C-alpha cells in the first residue's frame, strides 16, 4: 500500500491492460484519474465504475490523443502518469497522418502536460515488443538495448509497419523529451499479454493466444515461437516500477517463452473437449523459443507470480464465463466465435492497448499471410 495516498492518471483506462491496472491501483489506495474518450458511454466504462473502491478513489476524465492539450486537466495535480493508450489503424490509407503522427504527438502532448503540471514525479509508458525485435534477422535473446530497425521496416512495409514505426518513434521521442525536460520517464515493454480480463469484449491478444483451441490457423504463425506475460504480472510490474525510486530506463516484461507445440501439449489434456491439434506445420520438438529477457526487471526485485499454464487456464475460464468460448467446440461454434470477434473496433483501437492489438482486419482480426521477417506478426499483438 502507498504510505500516503497519491493521485495518478491512467490513459486508455477502459482497455484490457488499462482497466486491470486501474483495478490494482485502486486496491493499493491510489486516487486514480482514468482517461477515456467518452466518459458518458456506460457500455465502455461501467466495468471501471463497478470496481472496488471506485466510488471513493476513481474519477473518469475525457481525453483524446488526437486533441492537443486534451490531457492537461486530467494530469494537473497528479503525482504520476501511466500512459497505456495508443492509436491504431492498420488499414489506414494515410498512416503518416492517421497513425504515426498521432502516436508521437499524443505521447509528447501527455509529457508536456506532465511538465506543465509540475507535480508529476514519474511517467510510466506501456511500450511494445514491436519496438525491440522487428528486424530482418532474429536473435535468440532480446533485451532492453535492442531497438527495431526502422529502415528495414520502411523498406519492407510489412503488415502493421505503421504500428512498429509509430511505437518506436514515440518511445524514442519520449526519451529525448524526458532528458531535455528532466522528466522521470520509464518504459515497460510487454510481450503477448494473456490472462483474465474485466472488459466486455474479447481481447484480441487472446484471440491469438487461444487460436489452438479455436483452430484458427491464421494465428498459428504468430505464436509459433511466442513470448507471454500474465496481465496481472504486467500491471503489478507497472506499479512496482512506479514505486521503485531506483528504477530507470526500459524494462522488458515477459515471463515465459514457448512454442505453439508447448502450448498445445498442456491444453490438450486439460481441455480434451476442444480437440486441440497435436501437430503444427513447420513445428517440431527441435524448434527453439526466442527469448525476451526480463532480467533487468527481476534484478530490481520484481517476481512473476503466474505460470504459463495458469495464464492460459484463467484466460479460457474467463472467456467461457463471458460467453466468448463455448464449453466445447464444433465447427458451428468456431464460426460463431469468428462472427463475434468481427465486432472488435480495429480501426480506432477503442479500448485496445499493447498486448491486445489485432494484427490486421479479417473476420478474426488477423491475416494469415506471413510477414517479411520472422516474428513480426507477434509484435503487432504485443
From Swiss-Prot:
<feature type="binding site">
    <location>
        <position position="163"/>
    </location>
    <ligand>
        <name>NADP(+)</name>
    </ligand>
</feature>
<comment type="pathway">
    <text>Pigment biosynthesis; anthocyanin biosynthesis.</text>
</comment>
<comment type="similarity">
    <text>Belongs to the NAD(P)-dependent epimerase/dehydratase family. Dihydroflavonol-4-reductase subfamily.</text>
</comment>
<dbReference type="InterPro" id="IPR050425">
    <property type="entry name" value="NAD(P)_dehydrat-like"/>
</dbReference>
<keyword id="KW-0560">Oxidoreductase</keyword>
<feature type="binding site">
    <location>
        <position position="44"/>
    </location>
    <ligand>
        <name>NADP(+)</name>
    </ligand>
</feature>
<dbReference type="GO" id="GO:0047890">
    <property type="term" value="F:flavanone 4-reductase activity"/>
</dbReference>
<protein>
    <recommendedName>
        <fullName>Dihydroflavonol 4-reductase</fullName>
        <ecNumber>1.1.1.219</ecNumber>
        <ecNumber>1.1.1.234</ecNumber>
    </recommendedName>
</protein>
<keyword id="KW-0284">Flavonoid biosynthesis</keyword>
<dbReference type="GO" id="GO:0009718">
    <property type="term" value="P:anthocyanin-containing compound biosynthetic process"/>
</dbReference>
<comment type="function">
    <text>Bifunctional enzyme involved in flavonoid metabolism.</text>
</comment>
<dbReference type="InterPro" id="IPR001509">
    <property type="entry name" value="Epimerase_deHydtase"/>
</dbReference>
<dbReference type="GO" id="GO:0042406">
    <property type="term" value="C:extrinsic component of endoplasmic reticulum membrane"/>
</dbReference>
<dbReference type="GO" id="GO:0045552">
    <property type="term" value="F:dihydrokaempferol 4-reductase activity"/>
</dbReference>
<keyword id="KW-0521">NADP</keyword>
<dbReference type="InterPro" id="IPR036291">
    <property type="entry name" value="NAD(P)-bd_dom_sf"/>
</dbReference>
<dbReference type="Pfam" id="PF01370">
    <property type="entry name" value="Epimerase"/>
</dbReference>
